[in-house]
Amino acid sequence: MIQLQKIIPDLLFPRRCAVCDDISDIRGQGVCSKCQPRIVYIKEPCCMKCGKQLARQEQEYCRDCSRNKHFFIKGTALYDQGSMAESVFRFKYGNRPEYARFYGRDLYEKKRGFLEQVKPDALVPVPIH
């Protein structure tokens, strides 16, 4: 009976890869094996204000943060804009709440040090523009 309880949800609501959205056996991963290498994470150096990847190590702020005032103290980013744009759009606007586990785990694994250092009062998603 316990096995049936685990199988039925997968039959009714098959798991989808958070990158390509294909139905896939991704138990615990969130992303299929063919898509895992396609994810591009932002690496250092990063903007000290918003977290965008910078071209040069000696830069402190990106072009946008150098020129504009923002209404937040510090931000961070996980993915390069292009690699996960469609996935983030589906998650936010395409009724894919099942991606939340993948995004939450990925954020925790990759940005745990930052989050522990900053101790944010809230994690706020940014609108896609």
PLM regions and their residue ranges:
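Glycine-rich phosphate/pyrophosphate-handling loop used in enzymes and phosphotransfer proteins
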Residues: 1-129
